[in-house]
Design a protein with these regions (language model features):
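Serine-esterase "nucleophile elbow" of acetyl-processing enzymes
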Residues: 68, 266-312, 331-339
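Short beta-strand element of the alpha/beta-hydrolase
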Residues: 45-53
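C-terminal catalytic histidine-bearing segment of alpha/beta-hydrolase fold enzymes
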Residues: 36, 215-267, 446-448, 452
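Short beta-strand/loop motif that positions the catalytic acidic residue
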Residues: 198-205
Length: 468
């Protein structure tokens, strides 16, 4: 199949541009899973993979699939409609088909004039559940860059969603509370990792209850600080899709079009900056960290030539012996897959928790050095050969959460100095400026986490280091 696909690509590449506007690809040898491609005359680089609904029993290929192609193409967006296979109790079948489609579009970015950093997903009804599953569960390579969800099935709890979709997707696992929770995607939204979304539905949908599905997903996105828009139209029932007969069709098209126009599009040529860290990087305790955390403020300072991503995860340690080691997180795997050009490593605060120093002191220090080196080795092995900056943690003013500032100064900061010297890496000193903030105006009330003003100070320190 792979050989046939690349042969097809060769043929497509050799044909005149005007001759190749739409085509079909088999994702499985028997053609049970197919990808219908519609390429725009004037591509913007953006692409969307469309997943029609049908309760995981059938597919509404026209109204929720190919009929959307003219709209997207008119905006310069490449449209790929997926005919995915029904799960029949094996959820890996449709998930695998959808992930295959996402990877194929990204892998073919050059041939199809697509920006691999701007490939979204759209799903309607059960297709919305499949789309949100990729957005919340898939690895970096198959995860979409944005979501468009029409009246989506989100919950896998039969009492609050479309029962047929639950039966089709989970099969015999529909009564397993762990599986129900795992694939109720409002419970799986991950800050900084789940992509932005727009959700569109009708108030009087009798098939997929809005409150426990689309609105629940919006609420989860808002709680996690992930950008999300919600449109609930007064009427329309379920399945209005692309139909012009939908009373609010023109308004819906305008809403979707405006959202797409305002959605940031990151480019391959941008300098990619990965901010690795704990809750201080994550933006714990501040309102909308996607807008106000230090990585977000750094993005504003650096401008459009840079693409800054926040890979902070609360409570994480550098030390593998800690309770929650950072390198065990999806965020770490994402940071590597991001192929950054610059990496800011701001870990160590949670390593100053006394519970992580219960073993022999020297053993812990040796382990910390080893784990810093492991992270650096993984980053330097990337094909982008990123410039790595190590940072001293900010001062801990209060022993909140069991943290101890003296461990920072006597053990962790000296360890960072040693590792930086060994690897000839620059250091960004965040400890000294924050230790001089005696009125704690840069901190939240816990004396550990920076407020918005403190996040701006952190961003300024990083910005100054990058501009040297």
């Amino acid at each position: 199949m792979r050989k046939l696909f690349f042969l097809f690509l060769l043929v497509v590449t050799l044909l005149p541009t005007y001759a190749v506007r739409s085509f079909t690809l088999n994702l499985t040898p028997d053609g049970a899973a197919q990808l219908f491609a519609f390429l725009p005359d004037n591509p913007s680089g953006r692409a969307v993979v469309v997943l029609p609904g049908g309760g995981y029993v059938w597919l509404s290929m026209d109204n929720e699939g190919v009929d959307w192609a003219p709209f997207f193409n008119s905006k310069g967006i490449a449209c790929f409609v997926l005919k995915y296979r029904m799960p029949k109790g094996d959820l890996n079948i449709p998930v695998g088909d959808a992930e295959h489609a996402m990877r194929m579009v990204r892998d073919s970015a050059q041939q199809w004039r697509i920006n691999p950093y701007d490939v979204g997903i759209m799903g309607s009804s059960a297709g919305g559940h499949l789309a949100s599953t990729l957005a919340t569960h898939s690895s970096f390579e198959a995860r979409p860059d944005f979501q468009i969800l029409f009246y989506p099935v989100i919950s896998m709890n039969e009492r609050e969603t479309h029962r047929g979709s639950v039966e089709g997707f989970l099969g015999t696992h529909k009564s397993d509370p762990e599986m129900v929770k795992l694939y109720s995607n409002d419970q799986q939204v991950r800050r900084h990792l789940t992509p932005p979304a727009i959700i569109l539905m009708a108030h009087n949908d009798p098939v997929v209850p809005p409150i426990t599905n689309g609105i629940a997903y919006y609420s989860a996105m808002q709680r996690q600080g992930v950008p999300c828009a919600l449109y609930v139209y007064p009427s329309g029932w379920h399945g209005f899709g692309s139909q012009p007969s939908f009373t609010y069709h023109n308004q819906m098209i305008s809403d979707l079009s405006t959202w797409l126009d305002k959605l940031p599009s990151h480019k391959p040529e941008q300098i990619r900056v990965a901010c690795i860290g704990n809750s201080i990087t994550d933006g714990f305790g501040i309102y909308m960290p996607e807008d106000n955390g230090y990585p977000a403020q750094l993005q504003k300072m650096l401008g459009e030539k840079f693409y800054v991503r926040n890979y902070g995860v609360s409570a994480r340690t550098m030390n593998w012996q800690g309770r929650f080691p950072y390198m065990n997180e999806q965020a770490w795997r994402d940071a590597l897959a991001f192929r950054p050009n610059i990496v800011i490593v701001k870990l160590g605060t949670n390593d100053a928790n006394l519970v992580n120093w219960t073993k022999d002191h020297r053993v812990i220090k040796d382990q910390l050095e080893h784990d810093y080196q492991q992270m650096i080795d993984s980053l330097t092995a990337l094909p982008t050969k990123p410039q790595i900056y190590l940072t001293f943690p900010i001062k801990i003013w209060n022993n909140s959460f069991g943290l101890n500032d003296s461990l920072l100064t006597t053990d962790i900061i000296p360890c960072i100095k040693k590792i930086a010297k060994k690897n000839k890496l620059p250091i960004i000193d965040m400890y000294k400026p924050f230790s001089e903030n005696t009125d704690k105006s840069l901190y939240l009330s816990d004396g550990v986490h920076p407020n918005e003003k403190g996040c701006r100070k952190m961003a300024e320190l990083v910005y100054d280091a990058l501009k040297k």
